[in-house]
Amino acid sequence: MNLAKRILQGEQLTKETVLKIYEDTNIDTLDLLNEAYILRKHYFGKKVKLNMILNAKSGICPENCGYCGQSRDIKQKQRYALIPEEQIIDGAKVAHDNHIGTYCIVMSGRGPSDKEVDHISNTVRTIKSQHPQLKICACLGLTNDEQAKKLKSAGVDRYNHNINTSENYHDNVVTTHSYKDRTDTIELMKANNISPCSGVICGMGESNQDIVDMAFALKEMDADSIPINFLHPIKGTKFGSMDDLTPMKCLRIVALFRLINPTKEIRIAGGREVNLRSLQPLALKAANSIFVGDYLITGGQPNQLDYDMINDLGFEIDYDTCENKENKNDVSRAN
């Protein structure tokens, strides 16, 4: 197969080639994962970047995303307005203490008001004064140019806005905004020199072609960071009874994304615990980044299990990306 060697020599794989490889049952998933690992090791060694999410505003949303427990169609959900600055700042301290490189501040809704952007901006300034090396990622929805400039000025390093699925499959997932709304948001951030983060949710009924199209769309978008979420079905949502993933399929997807985006940060995100299950460690053979702790409205596994997983693989936390470098040689003692 020698895919990694070909890619390192400059070959650009086509969609047709990647789809054929992905669907070829004669190509063992672990062999494909090994090709991805060659690329991951070449560009990132054995380092793992750690990320943490804070749900700063929950359940107040007019959108009808079929995967989301915060959508307008869900009656029973956790709802609260944008939390006080102090709580967000406290979350940054927790991130620092847990060797987190990127702290992600997330808000529900179509997009933030100007008042909410000012609130986030003021908070980020305070966090940066206390933890200057902690990277801040904002995920606030659709924004305008003035809001993007405020976030940049405040010190926001990265902005997340996932494409979630392929352009072709988009309207099966959500109809209250367009695929272009999402890609335009990422382009706006790039225009304001904010690092673009955009990823996907797999397991919503998309085809193999859709999976390939997603990976190539993110390559064309030149997203710096690509979170791969695996659907964690939530009762009451459109995809609440979906069961389309196996651990091996998840690994195959992650390997495919690494082959197409060899130099990018690829993050294993929501749903990894319930979908990868005992094979979670193998995902880090292709991915070089994970979320630790809880997600927006679903729980994650205890941080210590993630530290142990990294250690057991012979990998290490990417201390170059985090401010807290204590316990550098023994993450098992981390809190």
From Swiss-Prot:
GO terms for molecular function: 2 iron, 2 sulfur cluster binding; 4 iron, 4 sulfur cluster binding; biotin synthase activity; iron ion binding. It holds the Pfam family BATS. [2Fe-2S] cluster binds at C104, C137, C197, R267. Binds 1 [4Fe-4S] cluster. The cluster is coordinated with 3 cysteines and an exchangeable S-adenosyl-L-methionine. Binds 1 [2Fe-2S] cluster. The cluster is coordinated with 3 cysteines and 1 arginine. Its EC number is 2.8.1.6. [4Fe-4S] cluster binds at C61, C65, C68. InterPro entries: Aldolase_TIM (IPR013785), BATS_dom (IPR010722), Biotin_synth/BioAB (IPR002684), Biotin_synthase (IPR024177), Elp3/MiaA/NifB-like_rSAM (IPR006638), rSAM (IPR007197). It comes from the Bacteria. Residues 43-269 form the Radical SAM core domain. Catalyzes the conversion of dethiobiotin (DTB) to biotin by the insertion of a sulfur atom into dethiobiotin via a radical-based mechanism. Homodimer. This is Biotin synthase. It comes from Staphylococcus aureus (strain JH9). The gene is bioB.
